[in-house]
Amino acid sequence: MKEGFAEKNKLFFVLTNSRGFTEEETIKAHREIVNNVQIAADETGMKYCIINRSDSTLRGHFPLETEIVKEEMEKRNSWKVDGEILCPYFKEGGRFTLNNVHYVKYGEELVPAGQTEFAGD
């Protein structure tokens, strides 16, 4: 994490591929990530913001991941997380959200994600 904080860039990624994790593995991994980010921030004196990016068809461990990140960040800091921004969209992959329904584009047709093969994954 310290290498990420030392980079010229203002942003770096921690790739977990946690969609394939069990619930227990997800909790452990996200606690470890926040802990390591906090240690690096404390050692460098830098502030940070964690952005949790998920799968474009909303598979995985939501809201568990963001709940763990929020809980761990608030344990280690005097500030509170105010909320979450959900923005399910991936144009290149044909993923769109319209009127609160998430769609997968098949050819020219938009199919609700819950009615696709992704829903059971």
Region roles according to the model:
Residues 1, 8-12, 21-50, 56-121:
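Cap/lid and interdomain-hinge subdomains that line or gate substrate/regulatory clefts
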